[in-house]
């Protein structure tokens, strides 16, 4: 039995999760959004700081050519950079493909290749090694972004740091 439902409520829905995040940044800018381990203590990040970082990273992804609905991989354990990367992918209009850090190199390559990931966020040297060892099976991956700056191995710039990605976005989309 069909019901008569007024569809006008659809116009009042938030368009997507990225917009929900940006709305929260606007409403709660100075409040704590995340707390994460740093050295021997804990650091806090406000909603505004998170929003600024996500915007930089999303702009960086766009500068790398990410198009709507293109896949971006994240091979990492749970950490605040994972959250920021995922939000950046959504804000850039992409879609996230996740890979457990315990996944072996062959399965990691299959997951990322099958989903045609263009960019992959990699937590550390262990994740980067899997990707570099299987690079021939990853024809779509144009760039690997590492969360740990020490992991940015010199390989002809296939691997860049999170900071380098943010800088790419900053350079391309800077408002003067």
Protein language model features and the residues they cover:
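Flexible, non-catalytic linker and terminal segments flanking ANL/adenylate-forming cores
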Residues: 1-16, 37
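AMP-dependent adenylate-forming
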Residues: 20-45, 151-154
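Conserved ATP-dependent adenylate/AMP-binding module captured primarily in the ANL superfamily
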Residues: 101-134
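Structured binding elements
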Residues: 93
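Structural motif
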Residues: 73, 119-121, 145
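Conserved AMP-binding/adenylate-forming core of the ANL superfamily
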Residues: 13, 33-87, 104-109, 160-169
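ANL superfamily adenylate-forming
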Residues: 126-176
């Amino acid at each position: 039995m069909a019901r008569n439902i007024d569809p006008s409520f659809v116009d009042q829905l938030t368009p997507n999760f990225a917009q929900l995040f940006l709305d929260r940044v606007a409403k709660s800018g100075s409040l704590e959004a995340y707390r994460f381990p740093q050295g021997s203590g804990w650091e806090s990040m406000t909603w505004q700081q998170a929003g600024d970082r996500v915007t930089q990273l999303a702009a960086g992804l766009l500068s790398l050519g990410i198009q709507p609905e293109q896949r971006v991989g994240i091979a990492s354990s749970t950490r605040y950079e994972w959250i920021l990367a995922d939000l950046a992918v959504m804000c850039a209009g992409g879609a996230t493909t996740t890979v457990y850090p315990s996944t072996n190199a062959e399965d990691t390559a299959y997951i990322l290749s099958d989903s045609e990931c263009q960019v992959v966020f990699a937590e550390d040297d262990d994740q980067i090694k899997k990707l570099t060892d299987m690079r021939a099976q990853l024809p779509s991956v144009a760039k690997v972004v590492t969360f740990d700056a020490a992991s940015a191995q010199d390989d002809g710039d296939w691997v860049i740091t999170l900071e380098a990605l943010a800088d790419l976005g900053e350079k391309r989309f800077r408002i003067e």
